[in-house]
């Protein structure tokens, strides 16, 4: 199976430094061309990529089965296996996500602001591509297509480094993307998959490849993200943990609370938007706590709770302090009764990860306070935490979720993969 850049020859390179430096230089050159690519050409390429992914489904699934088998033999967790596994529906969803990106408005060249100075200068702020985006991911093979498509749409070049778990699948998807690029005449190096499993390649990407990489996006476990944040010499869009809360406040409808809670926790337990902690307001604990805990247990979710939660069902096991700061990524949730909105917000501030947190209530004033005061990238009112997703936000797809405060926050889609420049129009003005 060829790597994404079929003509590069990088797969035969003996010297990793030379290999990665070459990838960086080629990406930088491709990025300059991509920044000027017409919107129509980019969209044609994306649609061709989606078509080729569908045509290559059998190959992608065959390679994915090999990856899954190897991961199972290596004793990987159920959560990792779930993120790694593709089926016909998931491959179709990957292609559809690429098409959705194609249908989005072009984020490049938009006038973000315009104003005139007293001296007659006309100043515009215009959106432009970031340049070269490095994406380092582990067990999510769909990131290959999502990241490549988003970078392409935003006029960037992408360097993709797949983890060992998903390398075969990523290579198969990458080959399909290469075909789409070739059909439309865009640079073959606009999207490159690093053709090695050598982990030292990650370290080289984090240096910026001699000024060729403008931003790094890690998609993977805590150890990967910690390493990237600690070692990167370029800006990073990332989140460390997804410790998401569902707070059942006073005024919550029990039926809605049950439905939203179960979706937040159990729809997919291994994603970063899955709820990890249930907070129930003391004002509704008598009516809501027991049925909510029973619903979780009956759905196959283990519950670790405080004394009040343990008291409603003998199957609840004690929670310790570490549980409030644990991203389980499994069918496990911690649960606690809190004394009012202030206590809920304080608990989230002390133990959360600034990712996604939800309040369930019909009290609009309480909801407004929660949405305003909880310092997370995404806060929801009467909606599942699992809406923390670029596709659900209408972004077509996402390259990741960012919880930092610089530039991108929340789902990172095409708009977040641009920056801006100022265009200054004069008529001969000079500065006194």
UniProtKB/Swiss-Prot annotation:
Pathway: Amino-acid biosynthesis; L-proline biosynthesis; L-glutamate 5-semialdehyde from L-glutamate: step 2/2
GO biological process, one term: L-proline biosynthetic process
Name of the protein described by the UniProt record: Gamma-glutamyl phosphate reductase
Molecular-function GO terms, alphabetical: glutamate-5-semialdehyde dehydrogenase activity; NADP binding
Protein localization: Cytoplasm
Protein family membership: Belongs to the gamma-glutamyl phosphate reductase family.
Principal subcellular localization: cytoplasm
The encoding gene: proA
